Amino acid sequence: AVKNMAEIAEFTERKIHYIQRFKTADFKIKNKLDAISHSTCSMAIDLDAKAIVVNSLSGRTARMVSRFRCPIDILGTTTSQKVWRKLNLSWGVKPVLCEEFSSLEVMLYNSLKEAKRMFNLQKGDNVVLTGGQINGKSGNTNLIKVEEI
C-alpha cells in the first residue's frame, strides 16, 4: 500500500508545473523572512539556477523557502542534528549537517562545495545562496547571493 501511494505521489508531482504555479500564486508576504524566501525562489527561477543553498541554524529559513514549492533543488545546511532531522521532512530540501564556521565567507564556500558535490553542479551553473550573518543566533536571515560555478 505504501509503495502504491509513493508511486502515485511521484507521478502526480512530475505532472505539476511548479514554475507556472509559483508565478501565478498569490503569496502573502508578511515579514522580512517571507520576502527573502520568496525572492530566493524567484531569483532561482529567473536565473535558471541549478540549486538553492540555505544556511540555517533553526531550519526556519529552509522551511520557508520550501513552502513556496520552488522547482529548484534546495540544500539546507545546519549545525544541529535535531534541525537536520526535521529538515528531512521539508518539501524539496536535502539537509546536510555541517560544522560551525568562523566566518560567513567560509560558511558560504563550504556550502557551495557541498552543493556542487550533492547536485553534480557544472561550470557555468548558477546557485542562489541565502542565510544570515554568523553570530550564533537564529532568526537573522539577511542575505541572498548568486554564485556561478
What is the predicted role of each segment?
Residues 50-53, 72-75, 93-96, 125-128, ...:
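Structural motif
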